[in-house]
């Protein structure tokens, strides 16, 4: 089994703020850091640090050499990365004193995938393999359909949410949504109702619903389960959801590690929020297995 991630590759410009800048306001920041990121890159690193065999596919911008190096250092295979001289993807992130974030995204070369490139990459994968997607790249619908034709199982993190309703979500095996995304897809507001509605609409899809500090839920053919969030002091929540996604898939696809997928993902994301940055905050599997609530 191999995991292919058609995923975004960004440089994250992170600004520490006492409070978020409001419309019409100019405010000096308390500090600035530059990190490797993008939901795709973060999730590839999370899966690799969790022990899954991961191949990342995407297009690097002119300044993207450090992104390739970061993936390689984490154990991600990078033979399906292509280089472009066009501007790459980047984000401008505000992080307030509570560790909450506000993110402005410029897609850059993440929106430059071509059908020929997608087909060439998918030709190296087949039945028994998994493709992971997020919504920070173009051609998501095309990749879903072509991957399904080749017998790959599809995992999809429906973030950012724009255009998601038009995708062939019935092809997705594992759908990751937060409360806002799940509510928009289902027309419901309560977590249990969101899960019921999405399972009724997509009966072949397992739905993973993240609830922030309230925990997470997972619904599939065997019913539903809930895992409360771990109580930790958050420093930066930027990479928490990506860490959760990568470790949940490790729980599903990897060897038994003694923790169910929801608990494994919850512990990993709890560790991630205690550290600054996105990709740099992702823990390795031994650390997650040794973690206890808040410790």
Stretches found by the model and what they are:
Residues 1-23:
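Positively charged, low-complexity intrinsically disordered leader regions
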Residues 2-3, 23-90, 291-294:
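Substrate-binding N-lobe of the ribokinase-like
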Residues 43, 142-145, 268:
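Aromatic/hydrophobic pocket-lining residues that form π-stacking "cages" and hydrophobic walls in ligand
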Residues 47, 178, 241:
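Short, conserved phosphate/pyrophosphate- and ester-handling motifs at nucleotide-, phospho-/glycolipid
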Residues 48, 148, 253:
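Gly/Ala-rich phosphate-binding loop of Rossmann-like dinucleotide-binding domains
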Residues 163, 192-295:
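Conserved phosphate-binding/catalytic region of the ribokinase-like
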């Amino acid at each position: 089994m191999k995991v292919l991630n058609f995923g975004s590759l960004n440089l994250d410009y992170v600004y520490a703020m006492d409070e978020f800048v409001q419309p019409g306001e100019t405010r000096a920041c308390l500090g600035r850091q530059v990190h490797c990121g993008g939901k795709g890159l973060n999730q590839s690193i999370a899966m690799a640090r969790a022990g899954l065999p991961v191949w990342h596919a995407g297009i690097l911008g002119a300044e993207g050499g450090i992104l390739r190096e970061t993936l390689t250092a984490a154990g991600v295979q990078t033979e399906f990365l292509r280089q472009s001289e066009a501007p790459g993807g980047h984000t401008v992130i505000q992080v307030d004193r509570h560790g909450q974030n506000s993110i402005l995204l410029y897609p850059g070369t993440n929106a430059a995938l071509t059908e020929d490139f997608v087909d060439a990459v998918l030709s190296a994968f087949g039945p028994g393999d998994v493709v992971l997607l997020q919504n920070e790249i173009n051609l998501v619908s095309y990749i879903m359909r072509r991957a399904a034709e080749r017998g790959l199982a599809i995992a999809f993190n429906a973030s950012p949410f724009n255009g998601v309703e038009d995708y062939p979500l019935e092809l997705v095996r594992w759908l990751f949504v937060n409360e806002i995304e799940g509510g928009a897809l289902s027309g419901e507001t309560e977590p249990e109702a969101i899960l019921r509605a999405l399972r009724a609409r997509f009966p072949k899809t397992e739905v993973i619903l993240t609830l922030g500090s309230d925990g997470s839920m997972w619904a599939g053919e065997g019913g539903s389960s809930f895992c409360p969030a771990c109580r930790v002091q958050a420093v930066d929540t930027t990479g928490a959801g990506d860490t959760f996604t990568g470790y949940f898939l490790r729980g599903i696809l990897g060897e038994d590690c003694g923790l169910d997928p929801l608990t494994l993902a919850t512990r990993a994301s709890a560790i991630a929020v205690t550290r600054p940055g996105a990709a740099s905050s992702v823990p390795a599997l031994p650390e997650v297995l040794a973690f206890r609530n808040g410790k």
